[in-house]
C-alpha cells in the first residue's frame, strides 16, 4: 500500500510533521496528514460505506451483487470480498467492544454477527460472506449465507426488493462522500484532494475517477444531495444515516466545489 496517513495530534510539532512527510515521500509513500478521530480519514469513511452496503443486503441485494456493482464501477474489491480478506471477526470484536462501552444504547445485531457466531470469519476459516476452496482465494457464493440473510430479513419482517447496479453504487459512494464532507468540516482532512489521495492509494478507488470527492463533483453535489434526501424519505429507520452533512449541503446549494 502506498498510502501513509500521518496523524497530527494537538501537540505535534511542525518540524516533526514536516519530517514525517519527507520520510514518507523518501520511502515511496503517499503521505496524507490527518487529524485525530476514530479511524482517521480512510477507515472512518469506510464505516458508512459498509453500512450502506449492509442496508442494501438487508433490503434485498445479495453480497455478490453489491460486490459486482462496485467492482464494475472500478473498485479493486467489493466490501464483502474485502471483509472476508480482512477477517469478519475483527469487526465483530469492535462491535462487541463498543456495545460494552455504551450499555445504555441497545445493540442492534447485524448479519455479520450471525456469520461470526457460525464460525465464518472469512478466508482464514474458508468461509465468510463467501466460501473458499483450500488454497484458493476465489470467492464462491454460498447457499448457507443466502439462507442466513433470508432468515435475518424474515425475523425483521423485511420483504426483499430488487436494486439496480446504479443504485447500489450511488448509495455506497454517496455515504462515503457524505462522511468525507464531515471530515473536511471538522478539519480532520485539510483538503478534499487529501481524501481523494487516501482512497486512490489506500482503498482501491479507481484512479480514472479521481477519488470519491472528485467523483461527487463530477456527478454534481446537488445530485448527490438530492439522492441522499430521497433515500432518507424512503426509510424512516435510515433517515438519520442519510442526513446530509452541512458542508455538503452548503456547497450543493452554492454550486461551489469542495476544496
Predicted regions and their residues:
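N-terminal glycine-rich phosphate-binding loop for ADP-containing cofactors
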Residues: 1-259
Amino acid at each position: 500500500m502506498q498510502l501513509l496517513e500521518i496523524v497530527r495530534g494537538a501537540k505535534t510539532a511542525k518540524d516533526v510533521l514536516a519530517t514525517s512527510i519527507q520520510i514518507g515521500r523518501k520511502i515511496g509513500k503517499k503521505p496524507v496528514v490527518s487529524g485525530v478521530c476514530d479511524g482517521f480519514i480512510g477507515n472512518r469513511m469506510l464505516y458508512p460505506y459498509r453500512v450502506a452496503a449492509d442496508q442494501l443486503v438487508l433490503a434485498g441485494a445479495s453480497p455478490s451483487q453489491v460486490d459486482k456493482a462496485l467492482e464494475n464501477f472500478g473498485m479493486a474489491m467489493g466490501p464483502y470480498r474485502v471483509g472476508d480478506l480482512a477477517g469478519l471477526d475483527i469487526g465483530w470484536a469492535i462491535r462487541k467492544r463498543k456495545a460494552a462501552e455504551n450499555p445504555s444504547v441497545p445493540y442492534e445485531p447485524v448479519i455479520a454477527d450471525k456469520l461470526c457466531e457460525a464460525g465464518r470469519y472469512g478466508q482464514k476459516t474458508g468461509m465468510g460472506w463467501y466460501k473458499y476452496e483450500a488454497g484458493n482465494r476465489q470467492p464462491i457464493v454460498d447457499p448457507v449465507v443466502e439462507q442466513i440473510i433470508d432468515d435475518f430479513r424474515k425475523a425483521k419482517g423485511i420483504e426483499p426488493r430488487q436494486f439496480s447496479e446504479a443504485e447500489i453504487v450511488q448509495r455506497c459512494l454517496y455515504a462515503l462522500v457524505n462522511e468525507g464532507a464531515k471530515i473536511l468540516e471538522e478539519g480532520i482532512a485539510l483538503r478534499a484532494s487529501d481524501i481523494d489521495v487516501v482512497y486512490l492509494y489506500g482503498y482501491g478507488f479507481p484512479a480514472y475517477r479521481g477519488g470519491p470527492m472528485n467523483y461527487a463533483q463530477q456527478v454534481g453535489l446537488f445530485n448527490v444531495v438530492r439522492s441522499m434526501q430521497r433515500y432518507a424519505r424512503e426509510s424512516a429507520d435510515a433517515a438519520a444515516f442519510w442526513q446530509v452533512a452541512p458542508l455538503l449541503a452548503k456547497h450543493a446549494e452554492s454550486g461551489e466545489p469542495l476544496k
